[in-house]
Curated annotation (Swiss-Prot):
WD repeats lie at residues 70-117, 122-162, 164-203, 294-325. One of its GO terms (biological process) is chromosome segregation. It comes from the Eukaryota. GO terms for cellular component: kinetochore; nuclear envelope; nuclear pore; nuclear pore outer ring; nucleoplasm. It is found in: Chromosome, Centromere, Kinetochore; Nucleus, Nuclear pore complex. This is Nucleoporin Nup37.
Length: 326
């Protein structure tokens, strides 16, 4: 008998607003807890959470808000900087946001008196994704509906600018070879750029469109995953520029794709909030069906924990967390 994969969230945290985006800090911050940031209609909250899976004396989840940052406009995207450190004196919290007013804001805080932000302007349409340089964090990349990928330094100056053939949906930096950048376009093309030569070196093609989200697998950078139309799609760049595996998953169109940080076979997808609730699914490449299905009334955002097989999704006045096995 087939086991039902539908699960309620293992843990929830109440929030003061509808959560548009949520991001675990993917970098080591020097503290045993996990930094998490989420964005609402006009603010960003940075908090710390610890789960019973990592600390036996905790029951469920322990969550504490560290700081709320006024944002003044809806938060659409959040990216953590590797410069964030909780074990330094004073601590450093550094992240950037993309917003509905087409601006990027770079926030820096010591969680006490120093709270600064800088505005980066240049995109002429909606910003779909942004990411920091994963080593030094001295640059960030963004992609937009304005058919560009832009690289910025922390002063707000553009250091590179790539013209795309369609809206840029996702951007990822290679974790080790930091001169390589992946950009996914809505027309189904994923290109890899050499930032030293400032040119494309490789491209992948999806047969489905619109491509809404793509992600580079950090555990195995030969693997790229995406969602387009109703399907999830996996490429192995050593084999072909065409997909290795494709599977339909979300009836109301797929929305987001994220690889787990700890396994090259584990990934999560979300659907658009459609006629039913928005569906959240965890998939394992060894299984033909999703290994976990969750339902969120109005879900948005998707992020994996840095060291656990645990996913966060934003909801209506709450954060929801699902746990699976590897």
């Amino acid at each position: 008998m087939k086991q039902d994969a539908t699960r309620n969230a293992a843990y929830t945290v109440d929030c003061e607003d509808y959560v548009h985006v949520v991001e675990f800090n993917p970098f080591e911050s020097g503290d045993s807890g996990n930094l998490i940031a989420y964005g609402g209609s006009n603010y960003v909250v940075v908090g710390m959470c610890t789960f019973q899976e990592e600390e036996t004396d905790i029951e469920g989840i322990q969550y504490k808000t560290l700081r709320t940052f006024h944002h003044g406009v809806r938060v659409d995207g959040i990216a953590w900087s590797p410069e964030t450190k909780l074990d330094s004196l004073p601590p450093v919290i550094k992240f950037c946001t993309s917003a509905a007013d087409l601006k990027i804001r770079l926030f820096t805080s010591d969680l006490q008196d120093k709270n600064e932000y800088k505005v980066l302007e240049g995109h002429s349409d909606f910003i779909n994704d942004l990411v920091f340089h994963p080593k030094e964090g001295q640059e960030l990349a963004s992609v937009s509906d304005d058919h560009t990928c832009r690289i910025w330094n922390l002063e707000g100056k553009q250091t590179a600018h790539f013209l795309l053939h369609s809206p840029g949906m996702s951007v990822c930096w290679h974790p080790e070879e930091t001169f390589k950048l992946m950009v996914a376009e809505k027309n189904g093309t994923i290109r890899f750029y050499d930032l030293m030569a400032q040119q494309a070196i490789l491209s992948l093609q999806s047969e489905q469109t619109p491509l809404m989200s793509a992600h580079w697998c950090l555990k195995n950078t030969f693997k790229v995953g995406a969602v387009a139309g109703n399907d999830w799609i996996i490429w192995d760049i050593t084999r072909s520029s065409y997909p290795q595996e494709t599977r339909p998953v979300h009836m109301d169109r797929a929305h987001l794709f994220r690889w787990s940080a700890i396994s090259e076979n584990l990934f999560a997808t979300t659907g658009y909030p459609g006629k039913m609730a928005s569906q959240f699914q965890i998939h394992h490449l060894g299984h033909s069906q999703p290994v976990l299905i969750g339902s969120v009334a109005v879900g948005s955002g998707l992020s994996w924990h840095r060291t656990l097989p645990l996913c966060a999704v934003g909801g209506d006045h709450k954060l929801l967390f699902w746990v699976t096995e590897i």
